[in-house]
Amino acid sequence: MASIIEKETGHPDERSEIAGVFVRRLQKDMKLQTDPTVIYAIGQQFDGDIRKKDLSIDSPYNTYKVKGLPPTPIAIVGREAIHAALHPKDGKTLYFVAKGDGSHYFSETLAEHNKAVKKYQLK
């Protein structure tokens, strides 16, 4: 979990909130659906852009297809990511999307998340 948190955000203040999202998704038997695991699965062929086709690759690291955590860490982790994994933020958010400035917008519902995706990703 900590390695995914490490790769998901560079904003230290968001780490525990991202950890909380992942914990709630696992508790609800939802897929994590997090891009860093797909990037890890793509490996050396990753060119900096995730495409829709990438989300369907067969890999135990593809959390868009496989429920639960990947079989191994996907990165070396720092102390802050470990702390966030051990102390996830309480809340109701289940989704987040990158805002383009390194931070994320967090949503409680899929409808709210889809609006945020349109706003921040599909410009």
Label for each model-derived stretch:
Residues M1-K123:
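Bacterial extracytoplasmic/cell-wall-associated proteins, especially those involved in peptidoglycan
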